[in-house]
Structure formats: structure tokens, C-alpha cells
Curated annotation (Swiss-Prot):
Gene3D superfamilies: 1.10.287.3980. NCBIfam families: rpmH_bact. This is Large ribosomal subunit protein bL34. One of its GO terms (biological process) is translation. One of its GO terms (cellular component) is ribonucleoprotein complex. InterPro entries: Ribosomal_bL34, Ribosomal_bL34_CS. Belongs to the bacterial ribosomal protein bL34 family. Residues 1-44 are annotated as: Disordered. Keywords: Ribonucleoprotein, Ribosomal protein. Pfam families: Ribosomal_L34 (PF00468). GO terms for molecular function: structural constituent of ribosome. Residues 1-16, 30-44 have a biased composition (Basic residues).
């Protein structure tokens, strides 16, 4: 049986990257929360 996670860099960036986070209000909320929490890495 094939494993479910077949990583692709382009897909990963497009779905979870910084620009995609910034492009929606909810994504901005995600970044805001992660900044408040003090995450070293904000997005993928």
C-alpha cells in the first residue's frame, strides 16, 4: 500500500507558505497568533 503523504515542495509552499497566509484575512490571523506565541518560524 502506498503511503498517504507524498511531499511536494511546490504544493507545500502554495498551501502553507507565507504569501498564501498573507493573502487571506484568516491566514493573517494565523500569522498574528504565531507571532504572539513567539514562533521562530511563522510559515512553511
Amino acid at each position: 500500500m502506498k503511503r498517504t503523504y507524498q511531499p511536494k515542495n511546490r504544493k507545500h509552499k502554495r498551501v502553507h507558505g507565507f504569501l498564501s497566509r498573507m493573502s487571506t484575512p484568516n491566514g493573517r490571523n494565523v500569522l498574528k497568533r504565531r507571532r504572539a506565541k513567539g514562533r521562530k518560524k511563522l510559515s512553511a
